[in-house]
Amino acid sequence: SLIVGSSDVYKRQILADKTLDFRVLNLAGNTFNENTTSYWHKSIGGYHAAKLRRYQEMIEEHISTEMNGVFKAVSEAGGDMQKVASSGFPVLNMLNTRYFIFPLQGGKTVPIQNPYTLGNAWFVNEVQYVDNANEEIDALHRIDPAKTAVVDKKFSAEVKSAAETDTLGTIKLTAYEPNDLKYEVNSKTGGTVVFSEIYYPGWQAYIDGVEAPHGRADYILRAMNVPAGKHVVEFKFDPKSLHVTETVAFVALGVLTCVLVLFLFLQVRRARRKID
């Protein structure tokens, strides 16, 4: 159902959605040069002077084109998403775009829920390996990300193609913090899971508390193999460079403390000699 109204109305409707994590695409303004949406929701757009290079490339290669297609298709369908083919915006679906915000006359807007979003994470049937980044971003024009993950071959050890996949397997995001995400994964066979989170160095993956390898898929997302059964998968932002910086800082502080103690010791000894 559509709720038409001011920006406050659409904000309230989307904020009332208690789904733990999703993204919003604002088509009612300059998508990549406004930050109001990002203030209230996780946004596909928003302005940032230092946007990640890969995400910027995805905007130019896929997202902008899909946005235009969505705007046209949904408008022609009168807002009825059942009349809109999901094949027209696969990248927006893999980015967990749950709501589109559409402009109306009189400065009003309407939020339209996307029934085709792939959610926070999903099992794929196959992994398609490519030789380089150019082939990776190009392959997204031809695959269905709900079924296939495109992986640069340099991540072939971290993201293996599963022999079989449980189509009834479930993945649920159970906790979300900016630097810590937890998922409950349950499947009979295990398989390759793609997570709708940006792949970035410094994130560590764990299965039931034990560190596990993960790699990049679909040019910007994370992927890993999860074994059969019920497991807790966790991602923590714990960059090793930060630990190195902390170690250097502690060593520097220790040296400074020793120098200060030595200086005070010499000052006291000098003062005593004068008294004597």
Per-region residue spans from a language model:
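Gly/Pro-rich turn-and-neighbor structural signature
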Residues: A16-T31
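A cross-kingdom signal targeting lumenal/periplasmic-facing segments of multi-pass membrane
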Residues: F32, T37-D131, S161-L168
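Short, low-complexity export/processing leader segments characterized by acidic and small residues
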Residues: Y10-Q13, F263
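Short, small-residue-biased leader/transition segments that mark boundaries at the very start
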Residues: L2-G5, V9-Y10
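Short, cationic low-complexity segments
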Residues: E126-A146
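Active-site-proximal, structured, solvent-exposed surfaces of multi-pass membrane proteins
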Residues: R98, G107, H141-D276
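Transmembrane alpha-helical segments
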Residues: S1, N26, N30, I112-N114
